[in-house]
């Protein structure tokens, strides 16, 4: 073990504010002191962050995005070896009519108002249980991936954690009580935090100041020589793993009707299912699908089911649903536990048939598109992408085929709902 001098971690006292012009668009970050990895409060704090925002969009902060009050917002925990932080990131909405971003001050006020619900313990046992089940399902999915397993093993080395903590993760999550979560939320999400106002900067891609070379000579390595450490690593025996190839013959096919076909395969790893509905239409023929699909990710259900209520209904079934679209196809992707597959499919079918899109979300989406397109001319990366796309595809380039900026303001809920229903 490497012995290092541990310096005391700075604790925020009251509200501290810092500002910096370092990005293409404004952002707000609220940063709180957290805990180091392996701390007894780490899992409870992760649950707190999930109560604020999660992949199912059922969190307290997720509601701000679903309601169109903020363009994007999320909470996360970063627990390192010696210290940790809790961070809330938010992107203000862009008002296309007034051609301006909402202020950092107004966004911070909205976020803090919602955060008080967590600080005051305003959540019930059912909500907490849904969050815990979602964390367990995501853990099961990670265990299907060799890449994620390797990442977890590397994190054990970095943080000095006990491997049994990973094996027993699900049991530890199940054991966390609502009283523990409320106590931890009140302890760490307090009035002591750093408010980082990241402001829009001009000419970020312009050529910067040229730095002088350092005064010292570079370290010269001996060509062909090996360090003792390299020799030790090479001496470690490596056993070749048994490669298990995919057996495509195990995939079952069934014709549902004249236009639909089912492909099915059993998941031998766990009880988690993943399902993808693939429709043979994309933005190449229906450009407005880009915006209809974006709204579907935060949609409710007719006649009167609001977006958050629909998300929580999915959450109670421990299912997660997302919509996506590319040039040629539209996708509806859902994952969850097999025991709730039928109920989750029934709920999803109702939303596909009777979507309830939100006008406030549409205005936020239009504002986001306006803001993004305004920054394109000052972004070398975007200009390079546009030029490459034109060289490859000429007039069929996505940048030329997309909806003109002047027409975005005319998008309506009725039109986008019709587009989505026509695609399905």
Indicate residue ranges for each PLM-predicted region:
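Non-catalytic, conformational "gating/processing" segments within enzyme and secreted inhibitor domains
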Residues: 1, 192-193, 389, 396, ...
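Peptidyl-prolyl cis-trans isomerase
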Residues: 176-180, 184, 356-362, 408-416
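M16 family metallopeptidases and their MPP-like homologs
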Residues: 25-36, 62-174, 195-199, 207-210, ...
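Glycine-rich, charged/polar anion/phosphate-binding loops
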Residues: 12-17, 33, 71-76, 180-182, ...
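Proteolytic maturation boundary segments
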Residues: 1-20, 26, 62, 165-279
């Amino acid at each position: 073990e490497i012995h290092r001098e541990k310096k005391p971690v700075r604790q925020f006292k009251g509200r501290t504010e810092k500002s910096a012009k370092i990005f293409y668009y404004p952002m707000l970050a609220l940063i709180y002191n957290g805990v180091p990895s392996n701390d007894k409060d780490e899992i409870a704090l992760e649950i707190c962050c999930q109560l604020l925002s999660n992949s199912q969009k059922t969190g307290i902060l997720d509601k701000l995005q679903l309601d169109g009050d903020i363009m994007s917002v999320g909470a996360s925990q970063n627990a390192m070896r010696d210290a940790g932080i809790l961070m809330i990131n938010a992107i203000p909405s862009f008002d296309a009519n007034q051609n301006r971003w909402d202020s950092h001050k107004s966004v911070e006020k909205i976020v803090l108002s919602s955060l008080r619900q967590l600080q005051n313990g305003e959540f019930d046992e059912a909500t907490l249980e849904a969050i815990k089940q979602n964390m367990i399902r995501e853990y099961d999915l990670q265990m299907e991936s060799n890449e994620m397993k390797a990442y977890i093993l590397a994190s054990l080395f970095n943080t000095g954690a006990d491997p049994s903590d990973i094996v027993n993760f699900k049991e530890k999550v199940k054991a966390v009580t609502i009283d523990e979560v409320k106590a931890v939320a009140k302890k760490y999400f307090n009035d002591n935090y750093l408010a980082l106002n990241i402001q829009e900067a001009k000419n970020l891609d312009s050529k910067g100041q040229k730095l002088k070379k350092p005064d010292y000579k570079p370290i010269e390595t001996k060509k062909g020589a090996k360090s003792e450490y390299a020799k030790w690593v090479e001496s470690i025996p490596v056993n070749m793993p048994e490669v298990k190839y995919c057996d495509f013959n195990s995939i079952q096919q069934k014709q549902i009707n004249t236009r639909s076909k089912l492909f099915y395969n059993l998941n031998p790893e766990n009880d988690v299912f993943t399902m993808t509905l693939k429709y043979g239409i994309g933005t190449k023929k229906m450009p407005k699908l880009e915006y209809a699909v974006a709204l579907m990710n935060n949609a409710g259900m007719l006649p009167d089911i609001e977006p958050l209520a629909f998300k929580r209904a999915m959450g109670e079934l421990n299912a997660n649903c997302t919509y996506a679209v590319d040039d040629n196809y539209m996708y509806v992707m859902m994952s969850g536990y097999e025991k709730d597959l039928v109920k989750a499919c029934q709920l999803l079918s109702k939303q596909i048939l009777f979507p309830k899109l939100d006008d406030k979300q549409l205005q936020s989406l239009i504002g986001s598109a306006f803001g993004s397109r305004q920054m394109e001319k000052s972004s070398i990366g975007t200009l390079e992408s546009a030029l490459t796309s034109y060289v490859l595809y000429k007039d069929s380039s996505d940048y030329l085929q997309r909806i003109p900026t002047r027409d975005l303001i005319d998008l309506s809920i009725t039109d986008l709902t019709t587009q989505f229903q026509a695609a399905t």
